[in-house]
UniProtKB/Swiss-Prot annotation:
This is Nascent polypeptide-associated complex subunit beta. The gene is EGD1. Its main location: cytoplasm. Component of the nascent polypeptide-associated complex (NAC), a dynamic component of the ribosomal exit tunnel, protecting the emerging polypeptides from interaction with other cytoplasmic proteins to ensure appropriate nascent protein targeting. The NAC complex also promotes mitochondrial protein import by enhancing productive ribosome interactions with the outer mitochondrial membrane and blocks the inappropriate interaction of ribosomes translating non-secretory nascent polypeptides with translocation sites in the membrane of the endoplasmic reticulum. Keywords: Cytoplasm, Nucleus, Protein transport, Repressor, Transcription, Transcription regulation, Transport.
Length: 166
C-alpha cells in the first residue's frame, strides 16, 4: 500500500490532541450582561452608605456650552441628607433643541437664558429663510419684465422734436 506522505502527515497533525507543541484551546468570552456593574463603583457607593433611588426615568445635566448630557433610564443612588447622588448609565451629548418639548419644566434660570438665545436664533433663522424665499419669488417675477432704463417723458419730447424737424 502506497500512501502519500504529505496526506499522512496532515492526518496525523489533525488527530493530535495533546502533548508538546499543540495549540491551546481558546476560551469563549462570557458576555457581560447589564447586571455586571463595576465592583469598584459598588464598593465606593457602599462606603458612602447610599441607597438606590427608584422611579427616575431620565436625568439631564446642563453644560455651560448649552448642550445637555442626557441619561435615559439611569441608575441613581443617593443620600439626601448629605446631598450626594450618583448617576450612572449611558450618557449621550445632545443639543437643547433635541429635548425642547419635554425639557421645559426642568429648565432653571441659567438654562432659560440659553433657551432665549436659542429662540432668538431660531426666529432669526426663520426670518432669513422667509426673506430668501421672498427674494427668490421676487426674482422669478422680475425675469419676465425688463428693467426701465430711460425716462419716458424725455423720450416723448425727443420724438416730438424729431417730428417737428421732418
Amino acid at each position: 500500500m502506497v500512501l502519500n506522505q504529505e496526506k499522512l502527515a496532515k492526518l496525523q497533525a489533525a488527530s493530535r490532541t495533546g502533548g508538546k507543541g499543540t495549540p491551546r484551546r481558546k476560551m469563549a468570552p462570557k458576555p457581560k450582561g447589564p447586571g455586571g456593574e463595576d465592583p469598584k463603583l459598588q464598593a465606593a457607593l457602599k462606603k458612602l452608605q447610599v441607597e438606590p433611588v427608584s422611579g427616575v426615568e431620565e436625568v439631564n445635566m446642563f453644560k455651560e456650552d448649552g448642550n445637555v448630557l442626557h441619561f435615559a433610564a439611569p441608575k441613581v443612588h443617593g443620600l439626601p441628607t448629605s446631598n450626594t447622588f450618583a448617576v450612572y448609565g449611558n450618557g449621550v451629548d445632545k443639543e437643547l433643541t433635541e429635548l425642547v418639548p419635554g425639557i421645559l419644566n426642568q429648565l432653571g434660570p441659567d438654562s432659560l437664558a440659553s433657551l432665549r438665545k436659542l429662540a432668538e436664533s431660531y426666529q432669526a433663522m426663520n426670518a432669513q429663510h422667509a426673506a430668501s424665499q421672498a427674494a427668490a419669488a421676487g426674482t422669478k417675477d422680475d425675469d419676465d419684465v425688463p428693467d426701465v432704463v430711460e425716462n419716458f417723458d424725455e423720450a416723448d419730447k425727443k420724438e416730438t422734436e424729431v417730428d417737428k424737424l421732418d
